[in-house]
């Protein structure tokens, strides 16, 4: 997306709308026209991302090849003719910094890619981007599904890595995961999604609702409610098992480029404290939903997780650019860390973070960040944090609607005001924040910098599009109160920068 194209498109849409709409409805008509223009621009941008050409490999760089079509794990992996076939074989290789790992286009590589420091992972050949699937297999086989004593509940033996969802026919439909809420006083157990009593798969009662008995003494089976054998009902069934697509850990100097990551229960790319992580020209779809842990945060139900690209910890030189993330349980991109009290004054700065030229669609949060400081005197902060030239749509909608906290989705999410999010040189510019299930943004910090300066971002030339009366969210250092989206939003946003435009769609029709 050109640096000035977003503002130009929105200006043109507003002018054409005002010329064609009734005087009483000019503003909302302009908002709808602008939204339509931006969705068209995003569709074209997605086509460009998917068609990104292969990256050039430097002469003399150690290079390894994987091919689902012709590869063999007993080969040496050093040429296209002697390519490996699986991510499991790649995991056994010792890769030197400066190496390149090339996945053949058109192939599907199942399992986690374990990343080595200083290595670039990208594509070769022709056709669609190579696909990294966390799903161990396609479950559209009637013989693998067994009818239980409940005639509408079918069992599939998937093992004990928790399944975050099942995706049918490439995303035409998906399953709703049932987790159990346990009343702390009575011990009674309930379906967290419906509120009805629930003790086992026998209590499933909604089409494509499922429960996974992943517990240590459980069966390891997924139980899915369906009137018909799922293997007959669907052409493909993929499982978001509890794993990453790429497991970076603390590896420095990693580039992940030109791949598609799908059907993982945790993160598409999961990293800890690291430096020089670059993610470019990638697509992420159907990410997350697996259980992080039971009973954390004082909850009486399990907590689920799943981001397309995550660093949990400190970082320096972290870039995500020219990517498309859609249908993500948590965040499209994120850097985050809760600094433990035992860290004392140890710094976990997040420096030189840039999210640019991406398209986010139906992620609970398009961009999420937090840097929570629990120890007085810890000076950790975000520095040179830039969010620019991104197109963001429908936060909190889609797959993530099965979350228990259905009022927290936002395009930028920082979890409000508190002992968190100290920031210097934080810039949000030339983005489109379009529609959300709840609020557009939640940007907060309760910490100043050492020189007394604000941790709030500068907002420049962004476009906000929301419905009248719905939540705008907040941008604040002092209050977690959320503001409604309406006539006063423009003046509020103008306090944080110039050139921003707030366009208002008409209020949604009430369901009878």
Which stretches of residues belong to each language-model region?
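Extracellular polysaccharide-degrading/modifying enzymes targeting complex plant/algal/animal polysaccharides
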Residues: 22-265, 270, 285-304, 311, ...
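Extracellular beta-strand/beta-solenoid scaffold signature
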Residues: 139-155, 207, 239-245, 263-270, ...
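Right-handed parallel beta-helix
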Residues: 252-263, 275-299, 305-308, 313-366, ...
